[in-house]
Amino acid sequence: MKTQMTIPYFTIDAPYELAYRNNGTSSPARPHTHNALEIYLTMSDLPDVLLDDTVSSVSKGSLIIIPPHHVHQLFNQKLTIYERYVLNINSDWLYTVLGAGSGLMPYADPAFSPAILRLSPTGLTGLCSQLDHYLQLHPQPSLSA
């Protein structure tokens, strides 16, 4: 007999949420999906990232781009410390800003597959600097991932 897993669906109501985390958890997030584009910058190696039906090892300094409504789980090891930046952008809000069908943000389209991009050291340093600067000006502690 096959067991079917129910995938939780979360709704991101805010236009966007940005958070920096450098911690572990006693109960990692299960595989899930939501209505937001998720951009995840990992500063730690992730041994078993689930994106749709594929599990991959992702090295630190990688950018993981997950279009809305794609099943994912980025880490599942209890009490392991993971350093990361997480940006969730509500897809409805993004389409309002950019214009649906504009082609300006293809990864906001659920038809696209998740992507893993390895950043150059210079690109990684620059992106972290910009994210840190934004977080200093606009702290958003509400994101729990």
Cite the ranges covered by each PLM segment.
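Generic protein-terminus/edge-of-domain signal
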Residues: 1-63, 70, 103-104, 114-115
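A hydrophobic/aromatic-rich effector-binding and dimerization subdomain
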Residues: 2-17, 71-140
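Short hydrophobic-aromatic micro-motifs
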Residues: 64-66, 87-88
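Hydrophobic, aromatic-enriched interface-forming segments
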Residues: 144-145
